[in-house]
Amino acid sequence: MSPKTETKASVGFKAGVKDYRLTYYTPEYQTKDTDILAAFRVTPQPGVPPEEAGAAVAAESSTGTWTTVWTDGLTSLDRYKGRCYDIEPVPGEESQFIAYVAYPLDLFEEGSVTNLFTSIVGNVFGFKALRALRLEDLRIPPAYSKTFQGPPHGIQVERDKLNKYGRPLLGCTIKPKLGLSAKNYGRAVYECLRGGLDFTKDDENVNSQPFMRWRDRFVFCAEAIYKAQAETGEIKGHYLNATAGTCEEMMKRAIFARELGVPIVMHDYLTGGFTANTSLAHYCRDNGLLLHIHRAMHAVIDRQRNHGMHFRVLAKALRMSGGDHIHAGTVVGKLEGERDVTLGFVDLLRDDFIEKDRSRGIYFTQDWVSMPGVLPVASGGIHVWHMPALTEIFGDDSVLQFGGGTLGHPWGNAPGAVANRVALEACVQARNEGRDLAREGNEVIREASKWSPELAAACEIWKEIKFEFDTIDYL
C-alpha cells in the first residue's frame, strides 16, 4: 500500500478526542485552482486558540466530528478534508480572526447551491467553541461554476429582448403591497407603465392571498402590459411573483405566465429555497422568461457583522442558482448598504472577472468565465432627488426601482412614472455630455424640472426626505 493510500485501518485505530488543529490546521498547504476557498470571520470562545477555532470550522464543515471514528480508516482524509490554511487578525478587534479554509471540489455535488451551503454553513455555526462566526466570502473555481447554468439569460440578452440600451432600466413596486383587488392592482400597473417605466413589480409577499388570487392578478397585469405597450411603443413587463408553498405550484404559476406571453416572472429565492430557485431558472431559460429575484429574509442572515453570512456570498450563490435581476441595496435610500462594499458585490454580480480587493470586501479573485451576469436592482426609499447618485453609482447595467417614489406622486401614478423617467433621461444625458453627477446632480434635476411639471411636483414633495443612519456593516 502506497503512503498516499495508507489509512488508519492499515496502521491501527486509536480512539479518543484530539485537537482539531492537529489534523485540520495546515499552514503549509498550497491551495489548488480547483479548491473552493472560504473566508470566515471567527470569534472564538475565551481560551480557544485561533488555530483551533479555524481548524474546528474546517473540520465541522467537511469531514470532521468531535471524536476520532473507526470509519476514518476506510477513506483518505487527506483527499477529502477541509483545511484551515491561514489565519489573520481582524484590525481593531482583539479576539476576532479571519480564517481561510480550502475545500476539495469532490466534497460538493455538481450544480447544487443547496449542497454547497449545507456543507459549508449547514452545521458549524452552532459550534460551542465559537462565540460567533460569519462567512465573509467564497471563491468559486471555474471547475465548479461551470456545472451551473447560472442566470436564465443575463444582461445582454435581456437588453436585446427589451430593445433598451444605454441607460438603467426603471421599475416600480406596486403599493400598498397587500390589500388591493386584482383589477385595481392591474390599473396601477398600467398607469405606471404608460407613464414611462420599463417594469412594475409584485412585492415579495404578494403570492395568492384571499384578497387577490394569483391567477386573477396575472391576467389583469398582462392586460395592463399589453395596453401600455400599445400606447407607448415600448416593451413593458411586470414581475409576476411565482413564489408558492410548493415547487409544483410555483411551476404552475410560471407556466401560466408564459402562456400569457409576459416577459418576466419573479421569485423570492431565500424564502423559496435554492432548489426551487434553480428549478425555476432552468424553466425560464428553456421558455424565454426573464427571472427577477427578490432577497426577502436576507437581513436575517447578513446584517450582523459578527455572525451569519455576508450578502456577497448570497449574491454569488444566486448567480450560480440563476436569476436575471436581484435586489442589491441602494447606498442612498432607506435600506442598508455601504458604498464600497455594495459596489463590490454589484461587480461580483455583473462582471466576468473580479480582482481581490479587501477595501471593497472582496477576499478572493473571482473568475466567472462565461457565466452571464445579473442586473443589480436598487430599491427602497428612493425618489427623484436620488436619481443622479443612483445613475452615477450603479451605471447603465442596473434597475432603479421606485415604489413610493412613483406611487406617492401628488398627481397620481402615471405622473409619478413620468417624473422618474424624465429625471433618469436628464441624468443620462448630462453624464454623456461629461457633467459630474456627483457634484452637479441636483442642478441637473432642477433644470429638467423646468420642462416637466410632473418632475417639478415630485421635487417639491420629496425635497426634505432623507434617511440618515450609519451603516452597521463595515469592513
From Swiss-Prot:
Reaction catalysed by this enzyme: 2 (2R)-3-phosphoglycerate + 2 H(+) = D-ribulose 1,5-bisphosphate + CO2 + H2O; D-ribulose 1,5-bisphosphate + O2 = 2-phosphoglycolate + (2R)-3-phosphoglycerate + 2 H(+)
Modified residues (N-acetylproline): P3
Catalytic residues (positions): K175 (proton acceptor), H294 (proton acceptor)
Post-translational modification: The disulfide bond which can form in the large chain dimeric partners within the hexadecamer appears to be associated with oxidative stress and protein turnover.
Gene Ontology terms for molecular function: magnesium ion binding; monooxygenase activity; ribulose-bisphosphate carboxylase activity
GO cellular component: chloroplast
Binding site for substrate: N123, T173, K177, R295, H327, S379
Cofactor remark from the record: Binds 1 Mg(2+) ion per subunit.
EC number from the UniProt entry: 4.1.1.39
Pfam families xrefs: RuBisCO_large (PF00016), RuBisCO_large_N (PF02788)
Main location: plastid
SUPFAM superfamilies to which the protein is assigned, alphabetical: RuBisCo, C-terminal domain (SSF51649), RuBisCO, large subunit, small (N-terminal) domain (SSF54966)
Keyword match Cell membrane: no
Keywords: Acetylation, Calvin cycle, Carbon dioxide fixation, Chloroplast, Disulfide bond, Lyase, Magnesium, Metal-binding, Methylation, Monooxygenase, Oxidoreductase, Photorespiration, Photosynthesis, Plastid
Highest taxon above the source species: Eukaryota
Annotated Mg(2+) binding sites: K201, D203, E204
Modified residues (N6,N6,N6-trimethyllysine): K14
Propeptide: 1-2
Subcellular localization, as worded in the UniProt entry: Plastid, Chloroplast
Protein's UniProt keywords contain Cytoplasm: no
Subunit text: Heterohexadecamer of 8 large chains and 8 small chains; disulfide-linked. The disulfide link is formed within the large subunit homodimers.
Function recorded in the entry: RuBisCO catalyzes two reactions: the carboxylation of D-ribulose 1,5-bisphosphate, the primary event in carbon dioxide fixation, as well as the oxidative fragmentation of the pentose substrate in the photorespiration process. Both reactions occur simultaneously and in competition at the same active site.
Protein family (similarity comment): Belongs to the RuBisCO large chain family. Type I subfamily.
PANTHER family, per database record: RIBULOSE BISPHOSPHATE CARBOXYLASE, RIBULOSE BISPHOSPHATE CARBOXYLASE LARGE CHAIN
Further information: The basic functional RuBisCO is composed of a large chain homodimer in a 'head-to-tail' conformation. In form I RuBisCO this homodimer is arranged in a barrel-like tetramer with the small subunits forming a tetrameric 'cap' on each end of the 'barrel'.
Name of the protein in question: Ribulose bisphosphate carboxylase large chain
Organism: Pseudolarix amabilis (Golden larch)
Recorded name of the encoding gene: rbcL
